[in-house]
């Protein structure tokens, strides 16, 4: 969502660059002797931003003062081992685990999802090796003082569609090392308007969203939509919290009843959006198994949701005991209901029409 919002905050750059990108990547337009559309968009964005700055409009927030001051970060610096900081952090372990466990699960699921996404685009990678490399390199980074874990980057079909291959990953790694060690990132940030890059991220998101529908059975579309709902709730709550925090208050201070009077069901957003990643997995699995008339498997996922909800991994802001007991109880009741459906009469599963194979990603995977 943020890339789209950034585009329309500075539409003279964002919308124009977005048009340049989708004209090439969706419309097949070729630019100036094969120059990549992303590079053309960034160049046009820089031209508009700096041109407007010299004319006094300052679209994109570029200025010579910022660019000049950014050169002060130039210099050669390499990561220094930080073993002491790593182990001294154990005194904060209880606080860290509240975030680390859900985030670790998210990173695992995201890596598996992205490997599957690559497979759907025609490139198969060994999942175990990918996850092992992901974890091992993250550990090395932590010992060097890096608080950010390595992640299998999202959007393989999109990068492949614009011509990215193994050299793209290698070049990215080399560039990140050079930019970081030489202190060039600040200069790049002061030279290139962020809004010129945002359309690329929006395009990747569009392609990933489309793939979720194109590469799954048509009958599973409702399940895909259902998995998005907890994330929308989490996003909505975050926007409300940040807005109230800037105003120096909070939802509890304002009052849930007052928020409800203007249509903001804050407690509902809080419950539904808590642990959105795991919630989406459970709800999506329930929906898929129900669509497939596999009631026993659907019923098996409900107790899983109950346990994770009880301990705060789902539908809660904190890990602990009895975080959302009423929601946990509802999942247990759902388990009995779904298991009972196994013995009820029900309509046969609709015949699947594999229309999703007409998409471009499917054509890649089905070519002889």
Residue ranges and their predicted role:
Residues 57-84, 243-271, 336, 340-368:
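Intrinsically disordered, low-complexity non-transmembrane regions of multi-pass membrane transporters
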Residues 324-337:
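Small-residue-rich transmembrane alpha-helices that serve as helix-helix interface/gating elements
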Residues 1-55, 179-325:
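Membrane-embedded alpha-helical modules
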Residues 93-166, 357-365:
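Membrane-embedded helical hairpins/re-entrant loop segments and their flanking transmembrane helices
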Residues 137, 141-197, 203-204:
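Long, well-ordered mid-to-C-terminal structural blocks that present hydrophobic/aromatic surfaces
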Residues 32-42, 77-86, 113-115, 120, ...:
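Hydrophobic alpha-helical transmembrane segments
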Residues 49-56, 68-114, 269-281, 329-332:
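Hydrophobic, membrane-embedded alpha-helices of multi-pass small-molecule transporters
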Residues 42-43, 103-107, 131-139, 173-177, ...:
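Transmembrane helix-bundle signature of multi-pass membrane transporters/permeases
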